[in-house]
Amino acid sequence: MSTNPKPQRKTKRNTNRRPQDVKFPGGGQIVGGVYLLTRRGPRLGVRATRKTSERSQPRGRRQPIPKARRPEGRAWAQPGYPWPLYGNEGLGWAGWLLSPRGSRPSWGPTDPRRRSRNLGKVIDTLTCGFADLMGYIPLVGAPLGGASRALAHGVRVLEDGVNYATGNLPGCSFSIFLSALMSCLTAPASAYEVRNVSGIYHVTNDCSNSSIAYEAAGMIMHTPGCVPCVREDNSSRCWVALTPTLAARNASVPTTTIRRHVDLLVGAATLCSAMYVGDLCGSVFLVSQLITFSPRRYETVQDCNCSLYPGHVSGHRMAWDMMMNWSPTAALVVSQLLRIPQAVVDIVAGAHWGVLAGLAYYPMVGNWAKVLIVMLLFAGVDGANTHTVGGTEGFTTQRFTSLFTLGPSQKIQLINTNGSWHINRTALNCNDSFKTGFLAALFYVHKFNASGCPEHMASCRPIDKFDQGWGPVTYAEPSISEQRPYCWHYAPRPCGTIPASEVCGPVYCFTPSPVVVGTTDRF
């Protein structure tokens, strides 16, 4: 039995339909579905095909193939022949220089405008149009046009990189509108503020006029790392720093007004993103920033020498002050992150519907980076209950860690000179010998340096030596001889206000242990 398949009968369905050759009376014909014209006589280098009627006759002498006739006379300046002394190359370069590229712009498939979208269309139209315009210039149009085209392609490469970074990374789909908000509400961190006094520049913490971003009723928004010094009624005073970028006349000024601004802006950004016109809104917002004029409400000067935080300059306050000077950006980010929990409560309690809409919409579309930006924006102006940024957290940590403080590691010795006790002629602060934590003193008593303690306590006055009186409570004015911090009745002298013009150098000295010299609080 054969295994070959059974032959099928050819029908109209299984028959391969091949085009038939058709000849036309005019001489043309269709061969294999292609229309061919009749050849009119032999060409140079090609032998003529014999006619059908001539095939039965004997072939005559083969005709030679005609060749092109060599021209007579000069050989240069002819098609295919060079000019003498490299004239052909020179004239070619001359023609390339004299013919502007703009008369025949052809970007081809690599045209940057083919891959543009949103704001990129505007940028690529400007760069490519500039390249075409440069090509119209005679003599230098060709090289300038080529360089401009290369520049346009380079800009397009940068745009592709930005589009990839902001569109393909999870949760990092930024819009121009939020970038515009960041440029308005959080000014870039500056390095140091300086003031010019008779041609001499001094480093100061007072904000310059260029550091002021926005002024409202009783509040000033500024760059981080400085504090506004406002002149009112012929006197200059430092304003209270509510946040690293927001200062108020006093700590009781509510920040509701500036927070409503943020609420409105975030709500507008959310609406633009939901309507897929975020880039258009951002472009309009950025352009409006260039033409918006905000009148000055206050006169900011630089003769206060403000501290970055008001009040007594403690060690932790001093450390935060130095951090603000060293890295204003890091201090700004840390302070805003620490305020996010309180900002969440204020958003809900204050009914900030624009911020709530943004926090509800952006997680649904997976833009978690925008959620963080909105929280940082609101935390940057959430200073209603904030008096010192980072100072509260630092003071709380200091109170807890002070229980375990072992005191100074240096073995000190107290010396009694004319009734006053001093520390062995070192630069250590006298109070450091008594800064041993309570728990550390209980469990590490053998390591606690208690030299001179009995003598110290013996010089303290008993309670019956104090004055008895009645009436309102007032501040005592102890004499210099009564300044004994080791006694239980020690009362420090009240802090006074020192004008900045009378302070030469820093307000505190850095010895082996920081010693606070004074502060220039001017309220």
UniProtKB/Swiss-Prot annotation:
Protein's name in the database: Genome polyprotein
Phosphoserine, modified sites: S53, S99, S116
Additional observations: Viral particle assembly takes place at the surface of ER-derived membranes in close proximity to lipid droplets. NS2 associates with E1/E2 glycoproteins, NS3 and NS5A, which interacts with the viral RNA and core protein to promote genome encapsidation. The nucleocapsid buds at the ER membrane where E1/E2 glycoproteins are anchored and afterward associate with nascent lipid droplet to acquire APOE and APOC. Secretion of viral particles is probably regulated by viroporin p7.
Site (Cleavage): F177, L178, A191, Y192, G383, A384
Gene Ontology, cellular component aspect: host cell endoplasmic reticulum membrane; host cell lipid droplet; host cell mitochondrial membrane; host cell nucleus; membrane; ribonucleoprotein complex; viral envelope; viral nucleocapsid
Region (HVR1): 385-411
Basic residues biased stretches: 7-16, 58-68
Native source organism of the sequence: Hepatitis C virus (isolate HCV-476) (HCV)
Chain residue ranges for the region called CD81-binding 1: 480-493
GO molecular function, one term: RNA binding
Modified sites of kind N-acetylserine: S2
Residue segments, region HVR2: 474-479
Motif Nuclear localization signal, residue range(s) on this chain: 5-13, 38-43, 58-64, 66-71
Region annotation Important for lipid droplets localization: where it falls in the sequence: 164-167
